[in-house]
C-alpha cells in the first residue's frame, strides 16, 4: 500500500480515536488538493460537454449520465492503468500498485466499498437526496467493483472524487470494514435491493440494517470535499457492502454481525424509502452491477439481489406494507450476511460495485463504529427477540407493531446506525418498523421459513411491541410526570392513580400476576384494547365524556374489563392501557396498568354493580376474586367507619393533592362546569380510592365522581354496592365527601341546585348518615303530597313529595340520565332530608314556632320545617333578626357546598335526606354502621357551608311557586379565599359562555356571590395579597354589568327580572356599606387631616393669599404642585408671588397629597350614599314582589344593612335558586 494509503488509514484510525487532529487535518487538505488535481486532469479524459458532477446527482439526466458513469466506473482495467500511472495513486487507499496482487486490492476495495457503503447509508439517511443520485453511480461503480479501489479516481472528476473518497473509505473500510464481512454481505444484498428501490432509502436502510459499515469513521463524509463530491454519496451501497465484509470482519466481525441484527431492527425505519428507491434505481444498473461484479459469486449474489429487486418494485409500489419487500430483502440479506462471512473475497467484487455509496456512509461510520459494541449486544438480543417477536407479531395486529415498532426501530437504528439513520428511521418509523419486522421475519424464514408478509408485519409489530413493552417498563417510571403535562387528563389520571395506588395498598389485594398478564394481553390484543379501551379510557380521560356519560363510561370500563375475563385485572388494565396508548403516554399506560389494574381488582366488584345499576349488563366472571377484594374493601370501608380517622387523613392528603388540581382545572377551563366537574372528579377520585375501591374503579371508568357517586348510590353498586358504599361512606367518607363538595358542590349548588353533583354528593354523605329509623319512615311517606306538610312535625314524607315536585321542574333542564339519578337521588334524599329535617323540626317545633311567623303559604310550618332542615345550624334562622342570621350565616354562608361534603359531621339532615328509600332497604342490613354514622353525624353536625343542597322548603309545598322553592342547605365549613375565587371564576366563565340573558345574569350574580364570599374570607383570613375592599369593588362592577344584561324597568320586564334586580340591589347596598366599613378608619383619618389642613391653611392664608381663589395662592403659578409636601409646593415661584417672608404654611396652594386625601374621603363617604340609594331601590322592587321576598325572608331571615356578608350570600343564593327554578334553568 502506498504511503498515502497508510496515511489515510492512519487518518481514519486517528479520527476514530480522535488523537492527532493536526495530522488528520493535513491529510484532509492533501487529499482535497489531490482530488482537485485529479478532477482537473480527468476533465481532459472526458468530454467537457458532459458536466457529470456540475449539477446535483439527483437531477436525472437520462441514460447518458448513467452510461457515462458506468463507463467511467465500469472499465476497471482502464482505471487500474490510470491509477497505476497516476503519481497520486498512493493517495488512494486500496488502489493496488502494479505489483500488488489484485485480489487483495479487491478485498480492500470490497471492504472499502462496504465500509463506504455503510458510511453512505448513514449519510444517505442524513442526506437522502444526495444518496439517491449517488446510488446510481454506485451501481456503476459496482460494475467496476475493482474500479472502486482503482476507480478511486473515476475518469470523470466527480467520479474520481467519489472513487477517491470511496477509496479512502475503502482504506478505512480495510481496517474497519474487514471486521464487517458478514454485515457487508447482508448489506450488499440489502443495498442492492434497496438501491434499486431508492438509494436514499437504501442508504437509510443500510444505515440501520447494514451497520457493519458503521465501523468506518465519518471523517471523509464530514469533510467539505466529500460534501462537494456528490457522486461519492451517489455511490451504490450494494458494492460497498459486498466488498467490505471480506476484510472488515477481521476487526469488527462480531460487531458487524450485531449490526446486521440491529440493522434488521434499524432497517425497518428506512426500508420504506429503499423500496421506493429500488423502484427507481432498479432500472439503472443493478443488473449491470451483477454483470460487472468481479467474482462469479458476486455476480450470482447480485443477480439474486437484482431479481429480488425486480420483485420489490411492485411491492415497493405497494409501500403500505413495505414489510413484504423487506422480508424478501432479509432473506438475501441474511444469506448474503452468512455468505459474506464465509465468502469475503467473492463478494468483494459485488461489494465493490456497491462501494460508491461509501461516501454517504462515511459520516455515519464513526458513529456506527462507536455503536458497534452496543449493536452487537443488540443484535444478539434481537436474534432472540425476533423469534419471540414473531410469535407475538403473529398474534399482534400490524398496527400495534407499527406503533411500537417505530419506537424500537428508531431505538435500534439509532443505536446500531448513525444519528442520521436513526433520524431517518424515526421519520419512517412505521415503515421502518414494518421493514424491520419483515427483515427479521425474512431472516428467520430464510433459515427454513418462507417469508410471511402478513406474519412478518405482525412479527415486527410484536417485536416492536415486545421491545416497546420492555422499553416502557424501563422508561415508565420516568414518564409518569408526562401525565401531568398531558393535560388535565394526565393530572387527573395521576390523581386517579395515586388514590388507586393507595387503595391498592390499603386493600393489598391486587395480584401482581394479574397485572403482568394484563400487560401481556394488552400487548397481544393491543388493537382490540386500543379500540375499545381507548374509548373507555377516553371516557375517563376526556372530561367531556366523563361528565356527559359517567354511567356509560362505567359500563364501558366494565365491558372492557369483561371481554378479557380470563384475567380479572386485564380488563381494567386493558382499558387504561389503550388510553395510555391513545394518549401517547407510555409511562402513564404502565402506571395505569398497575394502579388501574389494582384499582380494578379492588374496585371492580362494584364496577359491575355500577354497570348493572347503569343498566349495562356487564358480566365480569374473572372478578369474583376481585369481588373478594371488593368485599374486603367493603369490610375495610366498614372498618373505615371505625377507623375513619385514618381514612380521613388519607383522604385529606388525597384532597390536598386534588384541591390544587381542581383549582387548576377551574382556572384553565373556561367552562366552569366542566372544570368544576373535573376537579370534583379528581378530588373525589382520590378520596374514593381511599374510601372505596369501588368508587375508584367507577370514577376511573366514568370520570365523573358525581356520576360515580350517583351510580354507586343509585344502583351503580347495586343493592349490594349501596350497602358497601354506604358503609364505606362513614365519617371518613363523609369528611372526604365534604371536601369533594368543597370543590364540586359549591358551583353546582349555585349553578344547578338539582345538579347531579350536588345530589349525588349529598346522597353519599346522607347515605352514610342515615338513621335506620328515619329510613324506615321515608319509604312509607315518599308518595305523600306536599299538602300533607300541614304540620312540620308530620312525617317527613309529607315534605318530601313537594321536594319531588320542586325537583322535577329543575330536573327537566338536566339530561335524562342526570334527571333519572337526580329524581331518584334527590327525591329520596330530599324526602329523607325532609323527614329528618321535619323530624328535627318537630323536635324543635316548640322553639321554632316561636321564631317562625305564620306567613302566607303556611310559613309557620315551612319555617319550622326549614329551620330543622338546617337542623344542625347553631341557631334557627329567624327572619326577624338579621344579625343573628348573619352570625348563623357566617357559620353557614361561606360555602353552600352540599352538606354531603367530606365532613364526617356533614349535615346529618342532608345525609339522611340523600339516602334513598331503596337505599334504606339496602342499607338496613348494614343499619348498625349506618345508624352509628348517622348518629355521629347528627351529633357533630354543625351547619356546614356546603354549597346549597336543595332541601325542599315546606312553603314550596304550600305555595304556588313555592312547590318549586327548595331550601338550600348551607355548609358552615370554613373555606379559603382561594376556593371562593375559583368558584367565582368558574361561575363567571359559565356565564360568559351563556347566550340567554337571564341565565347569564343569574350566573354572573352567583359568581358575584362567590366573589363576595372570597372578600369575606379575605377579611377573616390572613390573606392580604388582595384587599377585601378591592374584591368588593370589583364585585360591584360585576353585579352592575349583570344587571345591565336584563333590565327590570322596561315594560317587558318579568317578575323574575325584578326579583333578580332586587337581589342585586341588596347585594350592592350591602357591598357599598361593607366597603365603607372597611375604609371607615381611613375616612376618619382623612377627615381629620383635611380638617386640620384647611384650618391651618385658612389661618395662614388670611394675610397674603386668602383661599378665595379656589384654594390657590393668588400668585402661585403651580397651585397643584407636583411635589407632595406644601413646603416644596411653596417653591421660589410661590414665594416670589407672595411675600418671600411667608412661611410655607401660609401658602394656600393645595398640595397633591391633600387633594388625593379629599378625593379618597369623598369616594369612601360616597359608598354610604350609594348603599342607601341601592337599598331604597331594592325595597321598591321588593314591594312589587312581596310574595317572593316574604317567603325568602321567612325562610332565610330578612336582610338588613347590618346583615353579615354570609347572611347576604345565603339569602341571595336562596333567592337565585328559586329564580332559577322558576325560569326552569338548570
Swiss-Prot record:
<feature type="region of interest" description="Disordered">
    <location>
        <begin position="116"/>
        <end position="164"/>
    </location>
</feature>
<feature type="compositionally biased region" description="Low complexity">
    <location>
        <begin position="123"/>
        <end position="132"/>
    </location>
</feature>
<feature type="compositionally biased region" description="Basic and acidic residues">
    <location>
        <begin position="589"/>
        <end position="607"/>
    </location>
</feature>
<feature type="compositionally biased region" description="Basic and acidic residues">
    <location>
        <begin position="523"/>
        <end position="533"/>
    </location>
</feature>
<comment type="function">
    <text>Putative transcription activator that may function in lymphoid development and oncogenesis. Binds, in vitro, to double-stranded DNA.</text>
</comment>
<feature type="compositionally biased region" description="Low complexity">
    <location>
        <begin position="409"/>
        <end position="445"/>
    </location>
</feature>
<dbReference type="InterPro" id="IPR043640">
    <property type="entry name" value="AF4/FMR2_CHD"/>
</dbReference>
<dbReference type="Pfam" id="PF18876">
    <property type="entry name" value="AFF4_CHD"/>
</dbReference>
<feature type="compositionally biased region" description="Basic and acidic residues">
    <location>
        <begin position="830"/>
        <end position="842"/>
    </location>
</feature>
<keyword id="KW-0805">Transcription regulation</keyword>
<keyword id="KW-0242">Dwarfism</keyword>
<dbReference type="GO" id="GO:0005829">
    <property type="term" value="C:cytosol"/>
</dbReference>
<dbReference type="GO" id="GO:0032783">
    <property type="term" value="C:super elongation complex"/>
</dbReference>
<dbReference type="GO" id="GO:0003700">
    <property type="term" value="F:DNA-binding transcription factor activity"/>
</dbReference>
<feature type="compositionally biased region" description="Polar residues">
    <location>
        <begin position="692"/>
        <end position="705"/>
    </location>
</feature>
<feature type="modified residue" description="Phosphoserine">
    <location>
        <position position="881"/>
    </location>
</feature>
<feature type="region of interest" description="Disordered">
    <location>
        <begin position="879"/>
        <end position="964"/>
    </location>
</feature>
<keyword id="KW-0539">Nucleus</keyword>
<feature type="compositionally biased region" description="Polar residues">
    <location>
        <begin position="42"/>
        <end position="52"/>
    </location>
</feature>
<feature type="compositionally biased region" description="Polar residues">
    <location>
        <begin position="894"/>
        <end position="909"/>
    </location>
</feature>
<feature type="compositionally biased region" description="Polar residues">
    <location>
        <begin position="334"/>
        <end position="344"/>
    </location>
</feature>
<dbReference type="GO" id="GO:0005654">
    <property type="term" value="C:nucleoplasm"/>
</dbReference>
<keyword id="KW-0804">Transcription</keyword>
<feature type="compositionally biased region" description="Low complexity">
    <location>
        <begin position="668"/>
        <end position="678"/>
    </location>
</feature>
<feature type="compositionally biased region" description="Polar residues">
    <location>
        <begin position="251"/>
        <end position="261"/>
    </location>
</feature>
<dbReference type="GO" id="GO:0005634">
    <property type="term" value="C:nucleus"/>
</dbReference>
<dbReference type="GO" id="GO:0016604">
    <property type="term" value="C:nuclear body"/>
</dbReference>
<feature type="region of interest" description="Disordered">
    <location>
        <begin position="323"/>
        <end position="496"/>
    </location>
</feature>
<dbReference type="Pfam" id="PF05110">
    <property type="entry name" value="AF-4"/>
</dbReference>
<feature type="compositionally biased region" description="Basic and acidic residues">
    <location>
        <begin position="24"/>
        <end position="37"/>
    </location>
</feature>
<keyword id="KW-0225">Disease variant</keyword>
<feature type="compositionally biased region" description="Low complexity">
    <location>
        <begin position="381"/>
        <end position="392"/>
    </location>
</feature>
<keyword id="KW-0597">Phosphoprotein</keyword>
<keyword id="KW-0010">Activator</keyword>
<feature type="compositionally biased region" description="Low complexity">
    <location>
        <begin position="550"/>
        <end position="561"/>
    </location>
</feature>
<dbReference type="GO" id="GO:0034612">
    <property type="term" value="P:response to tumor necrosis factor"/>
</dbReference>
<feature type="compositionally biased region" description="Polar residues">
    <location>
        <begin position="396"/>
        <end position="408"/>
    </location>
</feature>
<dbReference type="InterPro" id="IPR007797">
    <property type="entry name" value="AF4/FMR2"/>
</dbReference>
<dbReference type="GO" id="GO:0003690">
    <property type="term" value="F:double-stranded DNA binding"/>
</dbReference>
<dbReference type="Pfam" id="PF18875">
    <property type="entry name" value="AF4_int"/>
</dbReference>
<dbReference type="GO" id="GO:0035116">
    <property type="term" value="P:embryonic hindlimb morphogenesis"/>
</dbReference>
<feature type="region of interest" description="Disordered">
    <location>
        <begin position="523"/>
        <end position="728"/>
    </location>
</feature>
